[in-house]
Amino acid sequence: MDTELINKYVVLMEKIYSNSTTKYCSELSKLLNDKIDKFSLTASEELNKDFFHLVSKRKIESINNIEKESIIPIYAISKKETYYYEQIFQSLNKFLMDLITWEVLFFNDFFDMGIQQSAIYLNNIYKNSVNTIYDYTQKNLIGKNNDYFAISLMIIINFEQKKLMEKLNLNHLDFYFYEINKLLWPKFDQIYKATSEQIFKVNMKNNKLFTNGIHSVTHKLGEFLSMINLISKQTTNTPMIFAKLKEIQNLFNQFFYELTETMKFNNNNEREEMVTIFFINNIYYLLVKLKDFDAMKEENDPQSFDKILNNKRETYLNILIKKHFDEINKILQRCINKNNQANGVSFLENEVKKLTKNELKTVAQHFNNKYRDILNAVKKDIYSSIKDTENAKITYTKFLSELLNRYASFVDLLRMTKNDDLLMTIVSVQKLMIEINNITKTLNN
């Protein structure tokens, strides 16, 4: 091994790479688009559709372009192109990855060295280049960056690019990726806290903040949470992300309960129904944004979005049953033994004995004559109130199932009171179940 030749090569290449890296950082600075305040989550309390379109585009481009070749400044300048923080970051990392990948392969082959033997020489070659990019990133791409989406995407990019190097069995940049990660997460925490608090600072009496039943806070929070969801999917820091989602859940629930207190209604029944519908629409929207984050479905957490949605749906179903099938509902409420439902529905004998044949006949015949029309009316009611079609379908399907269960209990009550002649004239549970199954099938077409 010609040690003198190797040392001369190391000195020469270190200087070339160091100068090239410094120049590249300088040229990329001219291409940085940092004027995006008007597209931030907190720029306005009203909905900005351009903002949501831009965020979606940036997310897709970042995830799809992890391996994209580095930006060529002279070409970009000629085209008057500019780039977001995460794009500059991806380009710098890729520049460094390509530099080291090529140099490791060439150096080890040309000087006939193994990876361990060449490590000290290679470290001297690219040490200054790595430090230059690290310093530039720390100062310009993280220190001056208050873009929540950019920092989030940079966390993902850094994680994915480290995985690319691991696939090549090259660990030369492990420490660099680790140190960058140590810069990114504290910055994420800082922006996350400021942004999450600011999102909820709106005029609760401003009716312009509603779009098709969804509040602007929900729209913004959806984008905010979808990015957290994306970080959870793409990286391994799920416990920390989950803790932050818990914080958001509490803020969301507190905000919307306070918001509903500012709304005006004609009576308590209207208030209960409209507030319940409001929660179903807004929480479902957020859960769609978090569809890949299974930790949000912890049933034991009373503040979880999934738990609240289930509770609100149950409340809404009870409201609809009470509104459209109140006669059956009242009889069941009187007669069902609420203290003994572990093994199914049981009845209070004393209450059952108070039921008259005429009372049961009137209720049964009314259901028999009107249930199809009522089911259609309920469907229209749900689909006009629940804005998302899939959400409305789920809610209506649950309503049909709940109605079938209650009607089955009512029929059991008729059998218990020996009203066999009445049972012969009304729709059977089996027939109602078949009709409901057919309705459900049409919803999926």
Describe every region a protein language model picked out:
Residues M1, L32, E81, N300-Q303:
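Short linear interaction motifs
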Residues M1-V10, E14-Y17, T21, C25-L28, ...:
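Extended, charged coiled-coil scaffold/tether segments in eukaryotic proteins
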Residues E4-K8, L12, I16-K23, S91-F95, ...:
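Acidic, Ser/Thr-rich intrinsically disordered and amphipathic helical segments
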Residues N7-Y9, E27-S29, F111-M113, N203, ...:
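Short coil/turn segments at secondary-structure boundaries
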Residues Y17-C25, L32, I36, V104, ...:
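Eukaryotic basic, amphipathic alpha-helical target segments in cytosolic regions
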Residues Y24, L41-E298, I382-D421, T425, ...:
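Extended alpha-helical solenoid scaffold regions that build the rod-like backbones
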Residues E27-L28, D189-Q198, T262-F265, R313-L332:
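Charged/polar, low-hydrophobicity segments characteristic of intrinsically disordered regions
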Residues L287, K291-N445:
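Long C-terminal extensions of eukaryotic subunits of large macromolecular complexes
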